[in-house]
């Protein structure tokens, strides 16, 4: 049966069963309930027999006590009746009637007074709601709280007389209390809302704290905890900005700082020592404090004579609390820890909305204007850490500095990202103009005025010589404008007076580190593209190198302006070192791009394919240029008759070599129409000479070269020509040793006596050929300083100030206004030399002249020629007019 009842669906019982079935179910349920009761009684009776006996005993005692009390009441009634009967014979009838009349009159007056007092109290209850609302609207919270406590006191007294006949006829008293009861929550909510305000005065704070002490009868530590929690809520509310009331970020940050400072100041003025709150509590607890009825309107105060004394003289009672500095310090320390967590979570989010330095400067200026309170005394009294209460220095200044850094980093990253994207677009679009367009004359190539010529703006003609087209110049202009904004915003912060000197130095260093980091990342991204096409490589390296040359504000990020050096002291040299380092890094990375182009050009024009690998008679006839025939006249010491001999020496390099160099120049000009930087040219020449030396090494080991002195002499001439044209010096030790080793190898294939005769003339022909072909070699020709400076002349990728522009007027030591002095000397028969040209090969010539009899007359002639040449040079030099030197 029980199982059936448990499975019974109560929801469908009256829908699926008839009345008789429902009645049967009801009986079964009652039967089960009775059985359970019996089982419970049996179970309780067996296990808790003593408890049942105690309960029965208590019930019996209650009955006995009730009977005893009833008997006592009967005894009292009998005694009172007996007393009246005993005194009845001694009283006269007249006196009894007078007393009865007085008693009745007194009872009637008492009832009337009770009636008027009750009506006056009800009148007060009806007037209190409006009065409480008035005080709440005027932010007089303690007055509203005192009136609410007064109304509760009145209502409590009326409820105690609720069984009287009068109160039974006046239910309005109970209803009026139902109206006044919600004021407890209303007043408390208004107090809590007031304590959450941003601007909170001392008087209002004391009013609210006193109201909380009176309203909930709380102790002062609980009220202090509530006050600090509400100030935390006020701090969070300051940081919010709703859609209905949007607030500026600066206002929100300053308001939050004001809340923190004002909270500590209120604790100092209101709760520490004999402060305003404790003096107010003593006034309320003193006997001179007026009763609460005095807060009523004048019409209600006129009814005070009708009120009972307990109502008319009512006033709130206070026990003046005590709050030690240790308790206040402990509560304040807990609140500070909480505020640190809130500031880390919410204040940083608000600072993240600051987008420019001007807002930060306004925040710092406003914080300085509002003043920073000095809480040193309070920290000492409450045993807090030093500067623990300096919220601006501990919480806001670090966030300000962090935000300044983030603005610099984000601005730099945005500018660098935009520049990188524009470079990618230029690379994808390819060359916007034909290569030869760079050298076409345009109207805006030269400045149209002296002011334009003297300005710091990049000159268009100079930029075109470096391959910088309009798109590149525009890209650099945009990037430089972004950097100018960053420098200007940072300058605003540095000019701000409240910023510490160490913070200013830190910001300057951070700007330099950020610039270096962003440029390094840009180069890494550009290198990660793994460009292989020549136009793409040229666009990438041109735009990257242009950033250094056409963006003056980029240098300011490393080398500080003069206005910043008052804070950096000796770190200006360090900034120059960082600038040189980043320039070197850019040049190094761009040099790798240049080398890819150079290797590609050399791979497309391999000397092994362009030059003949074997020199036979056909190659000699087609490749060797016409040699020059010279007649030498020699005279012995004993014979006056001279001996003439004819020699043939090369006058220019092989035609295939000239053709190869010409084709290489054309290929290079088609790829790179602008001038090559010295370092790139040096790398190109080194690679080219390396390949040519490998080719000539193969020719030097060929049997045809070993068998033919003419072939060896022509190859020797070619190597001397390459050494002279490409200015291979001892500083380039590897190439220098390699080319001289091959020259010595080819020299071994030539007859020593013949080579002694050829050496001086070969040197002269090499110089003449180099001078004649130097213009044709064009871009392959190194700079004039290359022979003397070697690799040091190409230590930088930066172009000369004015490449490919004639020096019309200059006072520099390297620029000549006049050509070299002419040297007048008689030409010896068959000798083509100059006075200033001395080669290492001349020494063995002179030695041979002294040892070989056939060369004696020639040696004397040379010495005579040298002496006459010196005299002629000196005469021509000192014979000039002094007007030439002016």
From Swiss-Prot:
Feature: compositional bias, Polar residues? 848-857
InterPro entries found in the cross-reference section: COG1
Q: Which UniProt keywords apply?
A: Golgi apparatus, Membrane, Phosphoprotein, Protein transport, Transport
Region Disordered, residue ranges: 834-886
Instruction: List Phosphoserine occurrences by residue.
Output: 839
The record's GO CC annotations read: Golgi apparatus; Golgi membrane; Golgi transport complex
GO process terms (BP): Golgi organization; intra-Golgi vesicle-mediated transport; protein transport
Q: Which residues form the signal peptide?
A: none
* Basic and acidic residues bias: start-end ranges: 834-846
Tell me where it resides: Golgi apparatus membrane
Query: What membrane topology was assigned to this protein in its record?
Result: Peripheral membrane protein
Family matches, as Pfam families: VPS51_Exo84_N
Biological function: Required for normal Golgi function.
Assembly and binders: Component of the conserved oligomeric Golgi complex which is composed of eight different subunits and is required for normal Golgi morphology and localization.
**PANTHER family named among the record's database cross-references:** CONSERVED OLIGOMERIC GOLGI COMPLEX SUBUNIT 1 (PTHR31658:SF0)
The record's family statement is: Belongs to the COG1 family.
Name the chain's protein: Conserved oligomeric Golgi complex subunit 1
Species name: Drosophila melanogaster
């Amino acid at each position: 049966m029980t199982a059936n009842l448990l499975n019974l669906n109560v929801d469908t019982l009256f829908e699926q069963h008839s009345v008789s079935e429902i009645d049967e179910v009801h009986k079964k349920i009652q039967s089960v309930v009775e059985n359970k009761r019996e089982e419970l009684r049996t179970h309780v009776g067996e296990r808790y027999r003593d408890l049942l006996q105690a309960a029965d005993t208590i019930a019996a005692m209650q009955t006995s006590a009730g009977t005893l009390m009833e008997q006592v009441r009967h005894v009292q009634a009998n005694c009172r009746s007996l007393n009246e009967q005993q005194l009845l014979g001694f009283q006269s009838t007249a006196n009894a009637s007078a007393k009865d009349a007085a008693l009745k009159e007194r009872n009637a007056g008492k009832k009337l007074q009770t009636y008027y007092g009750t009506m006056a109290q009800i009148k007060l209850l009806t007037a209190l709601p409006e009065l409480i609302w008035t005080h709440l609207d005027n932010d007089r919270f303690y007055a509203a709280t005192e009136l609410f406590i007064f109304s509760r006191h009145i209502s409590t007294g009326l409820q105690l007389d609720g069984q009287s006949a009068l109160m039974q006829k006046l239910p309005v008293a109970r209803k009026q209390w139902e109206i006044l009861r919600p004021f407890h929550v209303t007043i408390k909510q208004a107090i809590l809302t007031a304590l959450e305000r941003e601007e909170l005065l001392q008087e209002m704070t004391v009013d609210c704290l006193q109201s909380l002490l009176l309203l909930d009868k709380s102790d002062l530590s609980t009220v202090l905890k509530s006050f600090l929690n509400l100030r935390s809520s006020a701090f969070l509310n300051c940081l919010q900005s709703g859609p209905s009331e949007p607030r500026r970020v600066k206002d929100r940050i300053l308001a939050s700082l004001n809340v923190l400072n004002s909270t500590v100041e209120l604790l100092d003025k209101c709760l520490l020592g004999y402060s305003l709150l404790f003096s107010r509590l003593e006034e309320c607890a003193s006997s001179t404090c007026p009763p609460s009825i005095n807060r009523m309107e004048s019409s209600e105060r006129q009814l005070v004579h009708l009120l009972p004394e307990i109502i008319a003289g009512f006033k709130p009672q206070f026990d003046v609390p005590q709050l030690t500095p240790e308790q206040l310090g402990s509560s304040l320390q807990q609140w500070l820890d909480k505020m640190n967590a809130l500031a880390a979570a919410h204040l940083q989010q608000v600072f993240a909305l600051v987008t420019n330095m001007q807002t930060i400067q306004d925040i710092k200026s406003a914080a300085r204007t509002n003043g920073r309170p000095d809480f040193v005394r309070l920290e000492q009294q409450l045993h807090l850490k030093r500067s623990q209460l300096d919220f601006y220095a501990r919480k806001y200044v670090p966030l300000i500095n962090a935000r300044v850094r983030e603005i610099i980093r984000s601005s730099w990253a945005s500018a660098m990202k935009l520049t990188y994207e524009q470079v990618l677009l230029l690379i994808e679009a390819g060359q916007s103009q034909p290569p030869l367009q760079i050298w076409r004359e345009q109207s805006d190539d030269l400045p149209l005025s002296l002011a334009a010529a003297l300005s710091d703006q990049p000159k268009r003609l100079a930029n075109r010589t470096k391959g910088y087209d309009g798109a590149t110049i525009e890209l650099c202009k945009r990037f430089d404008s972004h950097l100018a904004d960053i420098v200007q915003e940072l300058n605003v912060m540095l000019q701000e007076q409240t910023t510490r000197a160490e913070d200013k130095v830190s910001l300057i260093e951070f700007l330099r580190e950020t610039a270096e980091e962003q440029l390094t990342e840009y180069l890494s991204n550009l290198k990660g593209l793994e460009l292989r096409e020549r136009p793409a490589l040229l666009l990438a390296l041109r735009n990257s190198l242009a950033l250094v040359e056409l963006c003056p504000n980029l240098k300011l990020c490393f080398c500080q302006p003069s206005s910043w050096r008052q804070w950096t002291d000796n770190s200006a040299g360090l900034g120059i070192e960082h600038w040189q380092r980043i320039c070197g890094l850019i040049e190094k990375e761009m040099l790798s791009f240049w080398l890819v182009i150079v290797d590609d050009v050399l791979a497309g024009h391999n000397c092994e394919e362009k030059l003949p690998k074997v020199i036979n008679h056909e190659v000699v006839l087609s490749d060797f240029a016409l040699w020059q025939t010279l007649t030498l006249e020699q005279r012995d010491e004993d014979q006056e008759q001279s001996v003439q001999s004819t020699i043939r020496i090369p006058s220019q390099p092989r035609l295939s070599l000239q053709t190869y160099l010409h084709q290489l120049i054309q290929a290079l000009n088609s790829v790179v129409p602008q001038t090559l930087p010295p370092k790139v040219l040096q790398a190109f020449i080194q690679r080219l000479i390396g390949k040519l030396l490998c080719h000539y090494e193969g020719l030097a080991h060929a049997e045809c070269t070993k068998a033919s002195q003419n072939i060896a002499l022509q190859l020797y001439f070619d190597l001397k020509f390459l050494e002279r044209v490409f200015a291979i010096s001892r500083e380039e030790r590897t190439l220098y040793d390699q080319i001289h080793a091959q020259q010595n190898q080819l020299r071994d294939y030539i007859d020593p006596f013949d080579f002694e005769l050829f050496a001086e003339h070969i040197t002269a022909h090499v110089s003449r050929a180099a001078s004649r072909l130097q213009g044709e070699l064009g871009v392959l020709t190194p700079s004039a300083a290359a022979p003397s400076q070697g690799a040091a002349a190409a230590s930088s990728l930066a172009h000369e100030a004015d490449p490919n522009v004639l020096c019309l007027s200059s006072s520099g030591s390297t620029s000549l206004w006049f050509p070299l002095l002419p040297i007048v000397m008689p030409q010896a028969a068959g000798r083509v030399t100059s006075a200033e040209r001395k080669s290492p090969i001349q020494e063995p010539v002179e030695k041979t002249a002294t040892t070989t009899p056939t060369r004696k007359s020639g040696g004397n002639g040379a010495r005579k020629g040298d002496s006459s040449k010196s005299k002629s040079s000196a005469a021509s030099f000192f014979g000039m007019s002094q007007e030439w030197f002016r």
